[in-house]
Amino acid sequence: MNGGHIQLIIGPMLSGKSTELIRRVRRYQIAQYKCVTIKYSNDNRYGTGLWTHDKNNFAALEVTKLCDVLEAITDFSVIGIDEGQFFPDIVEFCERMANEGKIVIVAALDGTFQRRPFNNILNLIPLSEMVVKLTAVCMKCFKEASFSKRLGAETEIEIIGGNDMYQSVCRKCYIDS
């Protein structure tokens, strides 16, 4: 793929989205591309930077709106974005960056714990050159898991947590519980 484009990595909690994002960004770094990663600043589960659930860390800019980093990223040709579902300006930002010739890689939850589209992240699908939906392992029956199930009774959409608050589950286990 030459020129600007968007790569979208979606899936449930614990499916390896952040790990795949880091792998792709590192691949471009090895090829001497100038890369930057961005994470949602309200996600501070493990500390600063981009973290995977298995505690791998990667340096990242931290913001709540992507438009806040426009000036800081002008010299970068590859932009990795983790937790893309939380950014209200994700669609406009990615389209603008790709149109300016940048490679944009986004990792995001595709659905909420209620199995509804997560904010406007699915609007990136028709704008993306590459879309990958990862699965996790069902934490109840150990089959392929495509959904995230919240363990608590909270009803708000944006509650940031890991396997202490969410489980990846298959369709049957989601419905049965």
Curated annotation (Swiss-Prot):
Gene3D superfamilies: 3.30.60.20, P-loop containing nucleotide triphosphate hydrolases. It catalyses: thymidine + ATP = dTMP + ADP + H(+). Phosphorylates thymidine and thymidine analogs, such as azidothymidine (AZT). Part of the salvage pathway for pyrimidine deoxyribonucleotide synthesis. Zn(2+) binds at C138, C141, C170, C173. InterPro entries: P-loop_NTPase (IPR027417), Thymidine_kinase (IPR001267), Thymidine_kinase_CS (IPR020633). The active site is at E83. Pfam families: TK (PF00265). It is an enzyme of class 2 (transferase). PROSITE patterns: TK_CELLULAR_TYPE. Its EC number is 2.7.1.21. Keywords: ATP-binding, Disulfide bond, DNA synthesis, Kinase, Metal-binding, Nucleotide-binding, Transferase, Zinc. ATP binds at G11, P12, M13, L14, S15, G16, K17, S18. Substrate binds at F113, I157, E158, I159, I160, G161. It comes from the Viruses. One of its GO terms (molecular function) is metal ion binding. It comes from Monkeypox virus (strain Zaire-96-I-16) (MPX). This is Thymidine kinase. The gene is OPG101. GO terms for biological process: DNA biosynthetic process; thymidine metabolic process.
